Amino acid sequence: MSFQTNYIHLADEILSGKTSISYEQALEILNSDENWWEIYAAALYLKNQVSRNNIRLNVLLSAKQGLCAENCGYCSQSKESTADIDKFGLLPQNVILKQAIVAHQNGASVFCIAMSGTKPSKREIEQLCQVIPEIKKSLPLEICLTAGFLDREQLHQLKQAGIDRINHNLNTPEENYPNIATTHSFKDRCDTLERIHNEDIDVCSGFICGMGESDEGLITLAFRLKELNPYSIPVNFLLAVEGTPLGKYNYLTPIKCLKIMAMLRFVFPFKELRLSAGREVHFENFESLVTLLVDSTFLGNYLTEGGRNQHTDIEFLEKLQLNHTKKELI
Protein backbone atom coordinates (compact mmCIF):
# COMPACT_ATOMS: atom_id res chain seq x y z
CA MET A 1 0.00 0.00 0.00
CA SER A 2 1.42 3.40 -0.93
CA PHE A 3 2.16 5.83 1.86
CA GLN A 4 -0.36 8.69 1.84
CA THR A 5 -0.52 10.18 5.33
CA ASN A 6 2.23 11.91 7.28
CA TYR A 7 1.36 10.45 10.68
CA ILE A 8 3.71 12.67 12.68
CA HIS A 9 1.92 15.66 11.17
CA LEU A 10 -1.41 13.99 11.90
CA ALA A 11 -0.35 13.46 15.52
CA ASP A 12 0.52 17.15 15.85
CA GLU A 13 -2.82 18.13 14.34
CA ILE A 14 -4.63 15.83 16.80
CA LEU A 15 -2.68 17.23 19.75
CA SER A 16 -3.58 20.78 18.75
CA GLY A 17 -7.26 19.83 18.48
CA LYS A 18 -7.42 20.64 14.78
CA THR A 19 -8.42 17.19 13.57
CA SER A 20 -8.89 13.52 14.42
CA ILE A 21 -7.97 10.38 12.53
CA SER A 22 -10.30 9.36 9.72
CA TYR A 23 -11.61 5.90 8.91
CA GLU A 24 -9.39 5.79 5.82
CA GLN A 25 -6.28 6.73 7.78
CA ALA A 26 -7.05 4.10 10.42
CA LEU A 27 -7.39 1.47 7.69
CA GLU A 28 -4.11 2.65 6.18
CA ILE A 29 -2.39 1.84 9.48
CA LEU A 30 -3.71 -1.73 9.53
CA ASN A 31 -2.70 -2.22 5.89
CA SER A 32 0.70 -0.53 6.16
CA ASP A 33 3.89 -2.27 5.05
CA GLU A 34 7.13 -0.47 4.17
CA ASN A 35 6.09 2.67 6.05
CA TRP A 36 4.92 0.81 9.13
CA TRP A 37 7.72 1.83 11.50
CA GLU A 38 7.18 5.50 10.69
CA ILE A 39 3.55 5.02 11.75
CA TYR A 40 4.61 3.28 14.95
CA ALA A 41 6.98 6.15 15.75
CA ALA A 42 4.13 8.62 15.25
CA ALA A 43 1.84 6.63 17.56
CA LEU A 44 4.58 6.53 20.20
CA TYR A 45 5.12 10.28 19.79
CA LEU A 46 1.39 10.86 20.27
CA LYS A 47 1.32 8.77 23.44
CA ASN A 48 4.38 10.47 24.92
CA GLN A 49 3.04 13.94 24.25
CA VAL A 50 -0.11 13.11 26.22
CA SER A 51 1.09 10.98 29.13
CA ARG A 52 4.88 10.71 28.81
CA ASN A 53 6.27 7.46 30.20
CA ASN A 54 3.51 6.93 32.76
CA ILE A 55 1.60 3.66 33.03
CA ARG A 56 -1.18 2.71 35.44
CA LEU A 57 -1.48 -0.77 36.89
CA ASN A 58 -4.72 -2.71 37.22
CA VAL A 59 -5.35 -5.90 39.16
CA LEU A 60 -8.29 -8.15 38.26
CA LEU A 61 -10.18 -10.31 40.75
CA SER A 62 -12.51 -13.02 39.48
CA ALA A 63 -15.05 -12.61 42.28
CA LYS A 64 -17.71 -14.93 40.84
CA GLN A 65 -16.76 -17.56 38.32
CA GLY A 66 -18.54 -19.88 35.91
CA LEU A 67 -22.27 -20.57 36.19
CA CYS A 68 -23.10 -18.21 33.31
CA ALA A 69 -26.24 -18.50 31.17
CA GLU A 70 -24.70 -16.61 28.22
CA ASN A 71 -23.10 -18.45 25.30
CA CYS A 72 -20.14 -16.23 24.40
CA GLY A 73 -17.91 -18.38 22.21
CA TYR A 74 -14.63 -17.05 23.61
CA CYS A 75 -15.49 -17.51 27.28
CA SER A 76 -14.58 -20.47 29.47
CA GLN A 77 -17.40 -19.51 31.85
CA SER A 78 -20.26 -19.68 29.35
CA LYS A 79 -22.95 -22.34 29.36
CA GLU A 80 -21.48 -23.76 26.13
CA SER A 81 -17.99 -24.18 27.56
CA THR A 82 -16.54 -27.51 28.64
CA ALA A 83 -13.33 -25.88 29.89
CA ASP A 84 -12.01 -27.22 33.16
CA ILE A 85 -12.38 -24.19 35.44
CA ASP A 86 -13.30 -23.61 39.06
CA LYS A 87 -16.89 -22.46 39.57
CA PHE A 88 -17.99 -20.48 42.59
CA GLY A 89 -20.46 -17.85 43.74
CA LEU A 90 -19.61 -14.33 44.85
CA LEU A 91 -16.62 -14.35 47.18
CA PRO A 92 -17.16 -13.24 50.79
CA GLN A 93 -16.64 -9.55 51.46
CA ASN A 94 -13.58 -10.12 53.64
CA VAL A 95 -11.89 -12.07 50.83
CA ILE A 96 -12.59 -9.29 48.30
CA LEU A 97 -11.24 -6.68 50.73
CA LYS A 98 -8.11 -8.74 51.37
CA GLN A 99 -7.46 -9.04 47.63
CA ALA A 100 -7.90 -5.28 47.26
CA ILE A 101 -5.26 -4.74 49.95
CA VAL A 102 -2.86 -7.06 48.12
CA ALA A 103 -3.55 -5.23 44.84
CA HIS A 104 -2.73 -1.89 46.45
CA GLN A 105 0.44 -3.21 48.07
CA ASN A 106 1.56 -4.56 44.73
CA GLY A 107 1.29 -1.13 43.13
CA ALA A 108 -2.15 -1.15 41.50
CA SER A 109 -4.12 2.04 40.98
CA VAL A 110 -7.28 0.24 39.91
CA PHE A 111 -8.92 -2.84 41.45
CA CYS A 112 -11.19 -4.63 38.99
CA ILE A 113 -13.93 -6.87 40.38
CA ALA A 114 -15.29 -9.30 37.78
CA MET A 115 -18.49 -11.33 38.15
CA SER A 116 -19.73 -13.97 35.75
CA GLY A 117 -23.38 -14.17 34.75
CA THR A 118 -25.98 -12.16 32.87
CA LYS A 119 -26.35 -9.74 35.77
CA PRO A 120 -26.05 -9.86 39.57
CA SER A 121 -28.85 -10.88 41.89
CA LYS A 122 -30.35 -8.46 44.41
CA ARG A 123 -28.33 -10.11 47.18
CA GLU A 124 -25.09 -9.85 45.19
CA ILE A 125 -25.67 -6.14 44.58
CA GLU A 126 -26.22 -5.68 48.31
CA GLN A 127 -22.94 -7.46 49.04
CA LEU A 128 -21.07 -5.34 46.50
CA CYS A 129 -22.58 -2.17 47.94
CA GLN A 130 -21.22 -3.16 51.33
CA VAL A 131 -17.68 -4.05 50.28
CA ILE A 132 -17.10 -1.14 47.85
CA PRO A 133 -17.27 1.55 50.59
CA GLU A 134 -15.00 -0.58 52.78
CA ILE A 135 -12.36 -0.68 50.06
CA LYS A 136 -12.71 3.03 49.31
CA LYS A 137 -12.44 3.91 52.99
CA SER A 138 -9.33 1.80 53.52
CA LEU A 139 -7.37 2.17 50.29
CA PRO A 140 -6.56 4.80 47.62
CA LEU A 141 -7.86 2.52 44.87
CA GLU A 142 -10.25 3.16 42.03
CA ILE A 143 -12.78 0.34 41.71
CA CYS A 144 -14.00 -0.98 38.38
CA LEU A 145 -16.75 -3.61 38.21
CA THR A 146 -17.68 -5.95 35.39
CA ALA A 147 -21.00 -7.62 36.10
CA GLY A 148 -22.94 -8.14 32.90
CA PHE A 149 -26.06 -6.31 31.80
CA LEU A 150 -26.69 -4.12 34.83
CA ASP A 151 -30.06 -2.38 34.99
CA ARG A 152 -30.68 1.23 35.97
CA GLU A 153 -31.58 0.48 39.60
CA GLN A 154 -28.46 -1.65 40.08
CA LEU A 155 -26.28 1.05 38.57
CA HIS A 156 -27.84 3.66 40.84
CA GLN A 157 -27.10 1.51 43.88
CA LEU A 158 -23.49 1.00 42.81
CA LYS A 159 -23.08 4.73 42.16
CA GLN A 160 -24.32 5.47 45.68
CA ALA A 161 -21.86 2.91 47.06
CA GLY A 162 -18.94 4.73 45.45
CA ILE A 163 -18.10 2.68 42.36
CA ASP A 164 -15.68 4.54 40.09
CA ARG A 165 -16.14 2.69 36.85
CA ILE A 166 -18.16 -0.04 35.15
CA ASN A 167 -16.59 -2.30 32.54
CA HIS A 168 -18.79 -3.62 29.74
CA ASN A 169 -16.95 -4.48 26.54
CA LEU A 170 -18.39 -4.24 23.03
CA ASN A 171 -16.05 -7.14 22.17
CA THR A 172 -16.53 -7.52 18.41
CA PRO A 173 -18.13 -5.66 15.48
CA GLU A 174 -21.91 -5.76 15.19
CA GLU A 175 -21.85 -7.83 12.00
CA ASN A 176 -19.64 -10.44 13.67
CA TYR A 177 -21.61 -10.58 16.90
CA PRO A 178 -23.97 -13.45 15.96
CA ASN A 179 -20.88 -15.59 15.32
CA ILE A 180 -19.71 -14.99 18.89
CA ALA A 181 -22.91 -14.96 20.98
CA THR A 182 -26.64 -15.40 20.42
CA THR A 183 -28.06 -15.13 23.95
CA HIS A 184 -27.70 -11.35 23.72
CA SER A 185 -27.01 -8.84 20.96
CA PHE A 186 -24.55 -6.09 20.14
CA LYS A 187 -27.39 -3.64 20.81
CA ASP A 188 -27.81 -5.07 24.31
CA ARG A 189 -24.21 -4.14 25.01
CA CYS A 190 -24.58 -0.63 23.60
CA ASP A 191 -27.77 -0.12 25.63
CA THR A 192 -25.92 -1.15 28.79
CA LEU A 193 -23.20 1.42 28.10
CA GLU A 194 -25.86 4.08 27.65
CA ARG A 195 -27.39 3.19 31.02
CA ILE A 196 -23.97 3.45 32.67
CA HIS A 197 -23.47 6.90 31.14
CA ASN A 198 -26.94 7.99 32.23
CA GLU A 199 -26.01 7.22 35.84
CA ASP A 200 -22.91 9.40 35.44
CA ILE A 201 -20.54 6.49 36.03
CA ASP A 202 -17.32 6.29 34.03
CA VAL A 203 -17.36 3.66 31.30
CA CYS A 204 -14.61 1.11 30.69
CA SER A 205 -15.23 -0.62 27.36
CA GLY A 206 -13.10 -2.25 24.72
CA PHE A 207 -12.55 -5.19 22.43
CA ILE A 208 -11.41 -8.76 22.02
CA CYS A 209 -9.38 -8.87 18.82
CA GLY A 210 -8.89 -12.06 16.85
CA MET A 211 -12.44 -13.46 16.73
CA GLY A 212 -12.94 -13.35 12.97
CA GLU A 213 -13.55 -9.63 12.63
CA SER A 214 -12.45 -7.80 9.48
CA ASP A 215 -10.13 -4.80 9.56
CA GLU A 216 -13.01 -2.64 8.40
CA GLY A 217 -15.26 -4.04 11.10
CA LEU A 218 -12.70 -3.41 13.83
CA ILE A 219 -12.25 0.22 12.76
CA THR A 220 -16.01 0.76 12.62
CA LEU A 221 -16.24 -0.72 16.11
CA ALA A 222 -13.52 1.62 17.39
CA PHE A 223 -15.31 4.67 16.00
CA ARG A 224 -18.63 3.44 17.44
CA LEU A 225 -17.02 3.12 20.86
CA LYS A 226 -15.47 6.58 20.50
CA GLU A 227 -19.00 8.00 20.16
CA LEU A 228 -19.85 6.41 23.53
CA ASN A 229 -17.01 8.37 25.17
CA PRO A 230 -15.39 5.69 27.37
CA TYR A 231 -12.99 6.61 30.16
CA SER A 232 -10.77 3.62 29.41
CA ILE A 233 -10.43 1.11 26.58
CA PRO A 234 -9.14 -2.36 27.48
CA VAL A 235 -7.86 -4.16 24.39
CA ASN A 236 -7.79 -7.94 24.62
CA PHE A 237 -6.36 -10.41 22.14
CA LEU A 238 -8.18 -13.72 22.11
CA LEU A 239 -6.88 -16.29 24.56
CA ALA A 240 -8.11 -19.43 22.85
CA VAL A 241 -9.30 -21.63 25.72
CA GLU A 242 -9.67 -25.36 25.14
CA GLY A 243 -13.30 -26.35 25.61
CA THR A 244 -14.75 -23.18 24.08
CA PRO A 245 -16.03 -22.78 20.48
CA LEU A 246 -13.05 -20.51 19.76
CA GLY A 247 -10.61 -22.75 21.57
CA LYS A 248 -8.47 -23.44 18.51
CA TYR A 249 -8.92 -20.04 16.88
CA ASN A 250 -5.83 -17.95 16.20
CA TYR A 251 -4.92 -16.03 13.07
CA LEU A 252 -3.31 -12.86 14.41
CA THR A 253 0.40 -12.18 13.97
CA PRO A 254 2.50 -10.11 16.40
CA ILE A 255 2.94 -7.31 13.86
CA LYS A 256 -0.81 -7.19 13.16
CA CYS A 257 -1.52 -6.91 16.89
CA LEU A 258 0.95 -4.04 17.13
CA LYS A 259 -0.69 -2.27 14.18
CA ILE A 260 -4.08 -2.63 15.86
CA MET A 261 -2.77 -0.95 19.00
CA ALA A 262 -1.13 1.86 17.01
CA MET A 263 -4.40 2.46 15.18
CA LEU A 264 -6.32 2.57 18.48
CA ARG A 265 -3.75 4.99 19.92
CA PHE A 266 -4.67 7.41 17.14
CA VAL A 267 -8.42 6.84 17.58
CA PHE A 268 -8.22 7.34 21.37
CA PRO A 269 -5.33 9.79 21.85
CA PHE A 270 -6.57 11.26 25.14
CA LYS A 271 -8.21 8.18 26.66
CA GLU A 272 -6.74 5.46 28.85
CA LEU A 273 -5.76 2.72 26.40
CA ARG A 274 -5.14 -0.52 28.29
CA LEU A 275 -3.14 -3.55 27.20
CA SER A 276 -5.14 -6.50 28.48
CA ALA A 277 -5.50 -10.26 28.07
CA GLY A 278 -3.39 -12.03 25.48
CA ARG A 279 -0.41 -9.67 25.53
CA GLU A 280 1.90 -12.42 26.78
CA VAL A 281 0.88 -14.74 23.92
CA HIS A 282 0.25 -12.64 20.84
CA PHE A 283 3.00 -10.00 20.83
CA GLU A 284 5.98 -12.30 21.35
CA ASN A 285 9.13 -10.15 20.97
CA PHE A 286 7.04 -7.03 20.32
CA GLU A 287 5.58 -6.83 23.82
CA SER A 288 7.92 -4.03 24.86
CA LEU A 289 6.93 -2.01 21.78
CA VAL A 290 3.22 -2.27 22.49
CA THR A 291 3.65 -1.55 26.19
CA LEU A 292 5.24 1.79 25.31
CA LEU A 293 2.06 2.76 23.40
CA VAL A 294 -0.45 2.28 26.21
CA ASP A 295 -1.53 4.08 29.36
CA SER A 296 -2.27 1.08 31.55
CA THR A 297 -1.97 -2.68 31.80
CA PHE A 298 -2.92 -5.58 34.05
CA LEU A 299 -0.69 -7.14 36.66
CA GLY A 300 -0.92 -10.88 37.12
CA ASN A 301 -3.84 -13.11 36.18
CA TYR A 302 -7.00 -12.60 34.15
CA LEU A 303 -10.36 -14.28 34.76
CA THR A 304 -9.81 -18.02 34.35
CA GLU A 305 -6.45 -17.78 32.59
CA GLY A 306 -3.11 -17.11 34.23
CA GLY A 307 -1.10 -14.06 33.30
CA ARG A 308 2.50 -13.38 34.15
CA ASN A 309 3.95 -13.32 37.64
CA GLN A 310 3.42 -9.83 39.09
CA HIS A 311 7.09 -9.48 40.07
CA THR A 312 8.07 -10.26 36.48
CA ASP A 313 5.60 -7.67 35.18
CA ILE A 314 7.07 -4.98 37.45
CA GLU A 315 10.64 -5.84 36.43
CA PHE A 316 9.59 -5.67 32.77
CA LEU A 317 8.08 -2.19 33.22
CA GLU A 318 11.12 -0.94 35.09
CA LYS A 319 13.46 -2.14 32.34
CA LEU A 320 11.41 0.04 29.97
CA GLN A 321 11.78 2.94 32.44
CA LEU A 322 8.01 3.32 32.65
CA ASN A 323 6.76 5.28 35.61
CA HIS A 324 4.37 3.24 37.74
CA THR A 325 3.41 3.32 41.40
CA LYS A 326 6.45 1.87 43.11
CA LYS A 327 5.48 -0.17 46.15
CA GLU A 328 7.01 -3.24 47.71
CA LEU A 329 5.51 -6.39 46.23
CA ILE A 330 4.16 -8.93 48.72
Swiss-Prot record:
The catalytic activity of this protein is classed by the Enzyme Commission as 2.8.1.6
- Asked if the Swiss-Prot or TrEMBL record annotates the protein with the keyword 4Fe-4S, the reply is yes
Domain Radical SAM core as annotated: residue spans: 53-276
> Which enzyme class?
transferase
Concerning Gene3D superfamilies, the annotation shows: Aldolase class I
GO terms classed as biological process: biotin biosynthetic process
> Known Pfam families for this protein?
BATS, Radical_SAM
Cofactor(s) required, per the database record = [4Fe-4S] cluster; [2Fe-2S] cluster
InterPro entries reported in the protein's UniProt record: Aldolase_TIM, BATS_dom, Biotin_synth/BioAB, Biotin_synthase, Elp3/MiaA/NifB-like_rSAM, rSAM
Q: Where does [4Fe-4S] cluster bind?
A: C68, C72, C75
**Similarity field:** Belongs to the radical SAM superfamily. Biotin synthase family.
The entry's function note states:
Catalyzes the conversion of dethiobiotin (DTB) to biotin by the insertion of a sulfur atom into dethiobiotin via a radical-based mechanism.
The record's section on PANTHER family has: BIOTIN SYNTHASE, BIOTIN SYNTHASE, MITOCHONDRIAL
Name recorded for this polypeptide: Biotin synthase
Q: What is the lineage of its organism?
A: Bacteria, Bacillati, Bacillota, Bacilli, Lactobacillales
